[in-house]
Amino acid sequence: MSQAVKVERRETLKQKPNTSQLGFGKYFTDYMLSYDYDADKGWHDLKIVPYGPIEISPAAQGVHYGQSVFEGLKAYKRDGEVALFRPEENFKRLNNSLARLEMPQVDEAELLEGLKQLVDIERDWIPEGEGQSLYIRPFVFATEGALGVGASHQYKLLIILSPSGAYYGGETLKPTKIYVEDEYVRAVRGGVGFAKVAGNYAASLLAQTNANKLGYDQVLWLDGVEQKYIEEVGSMNIFFVENGKVITPELNGSILPGITRKSIIELAKNLGYEVEERRVSIDELFESYDKGELTEVFGSGTAAVISPVGTLRYEDREIVINNNETGEITQKLYDVYTGIQNGTLEDKNGWRVVVPKY
């Protein structure tokens, strides 16, 4: 698709926020991308419209039965050039999530073109400070106003944009405290753990709140059958460094196939590190720590990119990783990864997609 997407212009534009106080997900740009689906027409009426409230039926099936999926990616600006980071991977995963919830597939190329035009219109909203970016949230939900469990015949896709501050406030990486959850489970194989569906996040909130009350930042989930194999953290995939080797749980159908995870694996190999994707039990992890072999732990995700783990608690035992300091490999991966994202380091893998001026 190369033709321009229809744009419905606002009469007045918003005042842009102070870029030193952005935080995450607090401010939204002037426009959003909108796309509608019904069983007779398919996807239609792709357009850019003013950001604002939308009207849905009180009986909208997405509200009642949970047909709702989303994605998250970022755009970066440097010296006037705007680039997306691996957006094609997000739209592939979006389609995988849609398929799992019996929702209609989207044309990935068409959607990417629409996103580029939206980001181009909003390029003045993209902050250029250290660690800052434009967060992009595509999401799809069922809108048919009818009760009764079944796949909806109508859907809406929206893409909204939010200028975001540096995750670490422009400071050095800050190790997090992780609580290993051994009562609740996030997902089971054959379920929706591999998909980015809204319900996965709702189901994690109780355990997350309990962990916060105990003084921990996030929850580390174990498998849903034996509750012994490590899967992922609440909003991140998880990595371990043992004797210089980078290890991460293998994808098994209940772990989200993170795009940052995929990129970190490729990057680590390019940098000469040995990488293993395999099952890792929580007992093995603690044994590795006791032997002095576990030297670093970090999470990966769109928001933080890489988040070092300084403290890990399982049952009645708490361990401190690397004296609660960011490890050498963790820091190296973060520096190179973010350098590629923001354009200060060479993009040898072709991950950055430059947004043209239309």
Swiss-Prot record:
Its EC number is 2.6.1.42. Keywords: Amino-acid biosynthesis, Aminotransferase, Branched-chain amino acid biosynthesis, Pyridoxal phosphate, Transferase. GO terms for biological process: isoleucine biosynthetic process; L-leucine biosynthetic process; L-valine biosynthetic process. It catalyses: L-leucine + 2-oxoglutarate = 4-methyl-2-oxopentanoate + L-glutamate; L-isoleucine + 2-oxoglutarate = (S)-3-methyl-2-oxopentanoate + L-glutamate; L-valine + 2-oxoglutarate = 3-methyl-2-oxobutanoate + L-glutamate. The keyword Lyase does not apply. Pathway: Amino-acid biosynthesis; L-isoleucine biosynthesis; L-isoleucine from 2-oxobutanoate: step 4/4; Amino-acid biosynthesis; L-leucine biosynthesis; L-leucine from 3-methyl-2-oxobutanoate: step 4/4; Amino-acid biosynthesis; L-valine biosynthesis; L-valine from pyruvate: step 4/4. It comes from Staphylococcus aureus (strain Mu50 / ATCC 700699). GO terms for molecular function: L-isoleucine-2-oxoglutarate transaminase activity; L-leucine-2-oxoglutarate transaminase activity; L-valine-2-oxoglutarate transaminase activity. The modification N6-(pyridoxal phosphate)lysine is found at K196. Its cofactor is pyridoxal 5'-phosphate. The gene is ilvE. It is an enzyme of class 2 (transferase). Acts on leucine, isoleucine and valine. This is Probable branched-chain-amino-acid aminotransferase. It holds the Pfam family Aminotran_4. Belongs to the class-IV pyridoxal-phosphate-dependent aminotransferase family.
